[in-house]
């Protein structure tokens, strides 16, 4: 070959490589994120890898894909990966690379939210506590020590992703990355130092050359080329800060977190779907559900303070990895409908037309003839019939219908056709307990004694929830209270979060803060004797705060004053006398939660209702493959370990306050709107990953602070107990799209884990009333309803019945819109 030909061939080859690289690059324009040269409507869901086990990851990711997701979004948890300076950990639940590779294997993309501040109701917002003690540090502002550590960790993660070939241009799944997190409110408060920090963070991130777009959420002045994005229950109001950026929603909140002492939040899927459809209707092109699977705050990872161990979040995939229906199924249908509209959605902006006082249409068209319409009724009470394109459409209140061809309704946000699954927690075994009493006033070889009160985290460095504060009070023989029988009054003021007061070795009182206010004050009558008295206060942290500014200033523990009233002298201030400090429990120092540590002490017969007690039991793994949990309803407050691994904090003794009332999907949602568990424990059941168990000889260890009844603890299996469906004659269907006509609606029921339908508890075709678990017949009822469902469904794992009068022996009430409603038992 001639030299010139070789040169030409080389140039062509290089051009081909460059062209391939260019086509693989991820960019964006004003309409959407552009992947491989194509504008994309991207549906994403948050799954946080440390909140589930590696054994759960493949199934969670597959269920996310089956639910219609394109992207899995996760934070990167700095304190899990760098527990001490320069010492990195990327194994087990923190194997980030393995998690991302599993997402790639499933054919999904990744939005990697490096932060490295994450909030996330995670301990200390994801920051390692050692960061607080870097000299001269001030968090999340224009501070050189903080910026140096942040840049070092961010660079570490980016270089790791590059070395593993995980960015999209390398053939990996990462198409987006996030720097910082929800910084806008802090920037507003701090002013210029915060603005300088935000600009620095953006420039630092871009300089890492990831070749994928960077985003900042809740950061209105994110500098180019960073995309600012929205977080919230609704984001149809949001527009990016520059016209050349796409409209993105990084956190569509599927509900809210659970905290100890507050009701459990739920968000109706009708409202969630409505919020997402409103955002897409506005021109949004990226939606991420926060959370799609919430998981579990294992060990001491929960933040808050007072964040519960469960991070279920009422997500489409529940804490245990099971589908939450109808939320998962209804959103899956929404995603299908949106994807049918994609060619029109990415082509241009909507044309919005009023169809009534609270009704409108948003129509998207492409130059190739694609047309998609969203018909909205934002009235919170009334149904509406609207005229559009020469046809009439019935819209439930607070809903949107999606027409991928501007004619055929395939989905309405308020018409839920997916089944409703009611879960059961089935007893799977009890335990034979032994107990060991935690020693009070048991100091180590070299206890810390100093004048005055010390802040708790400065002493413990968050290596334990527990810190003992002990001081001594001398009482003279001539004190009047000794002879007149009166009590002294002890007052202890603490920054939080919980406190047990012991006088001469006896528990005298317990006090704790709340999600809204972690600070607390103990005031109680105490009996002292002549001579030396011991006052011991066990201060307990319940997760470090995860949101706010100036993390370096946050504190916990007894800061004072501590006073004693009723002495001859009046009030004695104990704040500035000598205090002795013991970090952690004696049982912790002996590793009683482990097999080796638990064998070093003598365990006795179990005691009940005794504070500061360790319990242990051995058990075999229950048969089957259903997810497992511990029912802790008989206990007060403490921590759980299985085979040495931390299940988390438990606190069923903290009852949820408030009045839960009824729930209606219509109208704006907030975290107080649809709640359960008022007057009950915020969390009763605690997830036990099956992968943590051996077939036999598993060690369960519990530390109980308050005093509970361990004989009431049981292992339970989580599975579907019953399934319900409520389907209208005119339920929109994806089949309508294929036939361009309105297909017959159909009821679908399905049990799980090999279960079959064993009984039809209720069935009615007509106008039934009530909700799943409490249905009743209405004024219109087809008498063959029960027989039809029994014949088609009993003995089957899944079944389907068409919602048409002839199936049920004729029309029981002509001219009336009818529904087929059924409840079936799985077993």
Swiss-Prot record:
Q: Please report the stretch or stretches of sequence annotated as the SUEL-type lectin domain.
A: 741-827
Q: Does the keyword section mention Secreted?
A: yes
What residue range is the signal peptide? Answer: 1-24
Subcellular localization, as worded in the UniProt entry: Secreted, Extracellular space, Apoplast
* GO terms of molecular function: beta-galactosidase activity; carbohydrate binding
For this UniProt record, the keywords arranged alphabetically read as follows:
Apoplast, Glycoprotein, Glycosidase, Hydrolase, Secreted, Signal
Quote the catalytic activity from the record: Hydrolysis of terminal non-reducing beta-D-galactose residues in beta-D-galactosides
> Tell me, which GO biological process terms does this entry list?
galactose catabolic process; plant-type cell wall modification
Know the name of this protein? Beta-galactosidase 2
> From which source organism is this entry?
Oryza sativa subsp. japonica
């Amino acid at each position: 070959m001639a030299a010139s030909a070789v040169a030409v061939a080389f140039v062509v080859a290089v051009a081909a490589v460059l062209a391939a690289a260019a086509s693989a690059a991820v960019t964006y324009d004003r309409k959407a994120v552009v992947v491989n040269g194509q504008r994309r409507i991207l549906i994403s869901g948050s799954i946080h890898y440390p909140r589930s086990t590696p054994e759960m990851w493949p199934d969670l990711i597959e269920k996310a894909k089956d639910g219609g997701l394109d992207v899995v979004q996760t934070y990167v948890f700095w304190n899990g990966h760098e527990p001490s300076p320069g010492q990195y950990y990327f194994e087990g639940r923190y194997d980030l690379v393995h998690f991302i590779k599993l997402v790639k294997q499933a054919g999904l993309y990744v939005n990697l939210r490096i932060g490295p501040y994450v909030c996330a109701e995670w301990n200390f917002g994801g920051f390692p506590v050692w960061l607080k003690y870097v000299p001269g540090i001030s968090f999340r502002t224009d501070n050189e020590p903080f910026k140096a550590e942040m840049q070092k960790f961010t660079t570490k993660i980016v270089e790791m992703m590059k070395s593993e070939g995980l960015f999209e241009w390398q053939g990996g799944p990462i198409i987006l990355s996030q720097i910082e997190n929800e910084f806008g409110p802090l920037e507003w408060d701090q002013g210029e130092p915060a603005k300088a920090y935000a600009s620095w963070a953006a420039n630092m991130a871009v300089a890492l050359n990831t070749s994928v777009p960077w985003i900042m959420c809740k950061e209105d002045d994110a500098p180019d080329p960073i995309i600012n994005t929205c977080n919230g229950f609704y984001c149809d109001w949001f527009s990016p800060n520059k016209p050349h950026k796409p409209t993105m929603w990084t956190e569509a909140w599927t509900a809210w977190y659970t905290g100890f002492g507050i009701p459990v939040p739920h968000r109706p899927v009708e409202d969630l779907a409505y919020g997402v459809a409103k955002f897409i209707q506005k021109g949004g092109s990226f939606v991420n559900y926060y959370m799609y699977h919430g998981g579990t705050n294992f060990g001491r990872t929960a933040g808050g303070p007072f964040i519960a161990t469960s991070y279920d979040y009422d997500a489409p995939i529940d804490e245990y990895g099971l589908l939450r229906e109808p939320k998962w199924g209804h959103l899956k249908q929404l995603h299908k409908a949106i994807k049918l509209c994609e060619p029109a959605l990415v082509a241009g902006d909507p044309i919005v037309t009023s169809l009534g006082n609270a009704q409108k249409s948003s129509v998207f068209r492409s130059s190739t003839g694609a047309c998609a319409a969203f018909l909205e009724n934002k009235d919170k009470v009334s149904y509406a019939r609207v005229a559009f394109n020469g046809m009439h459409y019935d819209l439930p209140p607070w809903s949107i219908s999606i027409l991928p061809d501007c004619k055929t309704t395939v989905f309405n946000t308020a018409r839920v056709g997916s089944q409703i699954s009611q879960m059961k927690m089935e007893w799977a075994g009890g335990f034979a307990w032994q107990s060991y009493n935690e020693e009070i006033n048991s100091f180590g070889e070299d206890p810390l004694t100093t004048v005055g009160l010390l802040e708790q985290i400065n002493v413990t460095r968050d290596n334990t929830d527990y810190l003992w504060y002990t001081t001594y009070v001398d009482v003279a023989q001539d004190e009047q209270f000794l002879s007149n029988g009166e009590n002294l009054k002890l007052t202890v003021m603490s920054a939080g979060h919980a406190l047990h007061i012991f006088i001469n070795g006896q528990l005298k009182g317990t006090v704790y803060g709340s999600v809204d206010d972690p600070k607390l004050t103990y005031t109680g009558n105490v009996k002292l004797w002549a001579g030396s008295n011991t006052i011991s206060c066990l201060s307990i942290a319940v997760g470090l705060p995860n949101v706010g500014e100036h993390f370096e200033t946050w504190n916990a523990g007894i800061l004072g004053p501590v006073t004693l009233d009723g002495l001859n002298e009046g009030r004695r201030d104990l704040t500035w006398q000598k205090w002795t400090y013991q970090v952690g429990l004696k049982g912790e120092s002996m590793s009683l939660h482990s097999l080796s540590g638990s064998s070093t002490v003598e365990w006795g017969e179990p005691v009940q209702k005794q504070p500061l007690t360790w319990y242990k039991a051995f058990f075999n793994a229950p048969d089957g493959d259903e997810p497992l949990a511990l029912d802790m309803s008989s206990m007060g407050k403490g921590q759980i370990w299985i085979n040495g691994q931390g299940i988390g904090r438990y606190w069923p003794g903290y009852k949820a306050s408030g009045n839960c009332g009824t729930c209606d999907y219509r109208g704006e949602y907030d975290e107080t709107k649809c709640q359960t568990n008022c007057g009950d424990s915020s969390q009763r059941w605690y997830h036990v990953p099956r992968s943590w168990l051996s077939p036999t000889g598993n060690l369960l260890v519990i530390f109980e602070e308050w005093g509970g009844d361990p004989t009431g603890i049981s292992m339970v299996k989580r599975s579907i107990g019953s399934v319900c469906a409520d389907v209208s004659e005119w339920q929109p269907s994806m089949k309508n799209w294929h036939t361009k006509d309105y297909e017959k609606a159909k009821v679908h029921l399905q049990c799980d884990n090999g279960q079959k339908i064993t009984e039809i508890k209720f069935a009615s075709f007509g106008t039934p009333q009530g909700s799943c678990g409490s249905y009743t017949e209405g004024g219109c009822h087809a008498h063959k309803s029960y027989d039809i469902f029994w014949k088609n469904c009993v003995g089957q794992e899944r079944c389907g019945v068409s919602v048409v009068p002839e199936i049920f022996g004729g029309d029981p009430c002509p001219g009336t819109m009818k529904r087929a409603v059924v409840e079936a038992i799985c077993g």
